[in-house]
């Protein structure tokens, strides 16, 4: 049985003070959650948020990292810096990183490998654009992203990582994939993992849905067999809304 995982990607929102307030408000609301709870604030908020969640059931993730240990990469953060802070998870390959910052399946793969070297659990994002879905090449696109993004890993590593399926056309647009579409596509992603690493591994991998997840949509989504959680954007910025999703 896979334990559900619900993660909030705060993107470029919340000052340090606001981030601490949000977590403070969230803690009592989700203390009895039956799923794993993760918040992913900006880098500058990580130390304060990590301090605030101590002793609670909330884990902390970063929104990105570089694949090099150190060096002349102005504005970037190395995995060992996150590890030293006590960060648990790291989002890798989010569609916004792919769209605006030239993230590729190859850099995703380098980051995934490096995350494991530093005891970070990657939340690996994949997803298709509206054009790709309408062109009926969703499966081809996802297969390419997974086969490159997750190549050359050990079975133990693959079992630990989290995959987030985020149909790009449903992010921040208010559009969502139907529950059937999401379930079917996530099932396909699991098949790709099975082809690469075997059925036992594929059965253990947790795959989230991330596309305009709201308190009103989560229950039906989580009732689907293949969906193991959610990567939540805008709705994770309000404690009440995020708690409603976590306590689905």
UniProtKB/Swiss-Prot annotation:
SUPFAM superfamilies documented for this protein: Triosephosphate isomerase (TIM)
Name of a matching Pfam family: TIM
Principal EC category: isomerase
Annotated substrate binding sites: 9-11, 172, 212, 233-234
EC number(s) stated in the UniProt entry for this protein: 5.3.1.1
Main location: cytoplasm
Alphabetical GO biological process terms: gluconeogenesis; glyceraldehyde-3-phosphate biosynthetic process; glycerol catabolic process; glycolytic process
Functional description taken from the UniProt entry: Involved in the gluconeogenesis. Catalyzes stereospecifically the conversion of dihydroxyacetone phosphate (DHAP) to D-glyceraldehyde-3-phosphate (G3P).
Subunit structure: Homodimer.
HAMAP family (UniProt xref): TIM_B
Family assignment from sequence similarity: Belongs to the triosephosphate isomerase family.
Name of the molecule in the record: Triosephosphate isomerase
Organism annotation: Clostridium botulinum (strain Langeland / NCTC 10281 / Type F)
Gene behind the chain: tpiA
């Amino acid at each position: 049985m896979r334990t559900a995982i619900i993660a909030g990607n705060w993107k470029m929102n919340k000052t340090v003070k606001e981030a601490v307030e949000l977590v403070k408000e969230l803690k009592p609301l989700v203390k009895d959650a039956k799923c794993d709870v993760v918040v992913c604030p900006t880098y500058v908020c990580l130390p304060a948020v990590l301090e605030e969640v101590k002793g609670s059931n909330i884990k902390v993730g970063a929104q990105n990292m570089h694949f090099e240990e150190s060096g002349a990469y102005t504005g970037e953060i190395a995995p060992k810096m996150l590890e030293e802070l006590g960060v648990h998870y790291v989002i890798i390959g989010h569609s916004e990183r792919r769209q605006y910052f030239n993230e590729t399946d190859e850099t995703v793969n380098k980051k995934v490998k490096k995350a494991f070297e530093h005891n970070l659990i990657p939340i690996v994002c994949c997803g298709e654009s509206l054009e790709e879905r309408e062109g009926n090449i969703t499966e081809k696109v996802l297969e390419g992203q997974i086969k490159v993004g997750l190549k050359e890993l050990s079975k133990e590593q693959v079992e630990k990582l989290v995959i987030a399926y985020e149909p790009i056309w449903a992010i921040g647009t208010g559009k969502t994939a139907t529950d059937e579409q999401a379930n079917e596509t996530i099932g396909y992603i699991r098949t790709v993992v099975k082809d690469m690493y075997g059925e036992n591994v594929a059965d253990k991998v947790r795959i989230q849905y991330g596309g305009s997840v709201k308190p009103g949509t989560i229950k039906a989504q989580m009732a689907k067999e293949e969906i193991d959680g959610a990567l939540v954007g805008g709705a994770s910025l309000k404690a009440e809304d995020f708690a409603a999703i976590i306590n689905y």
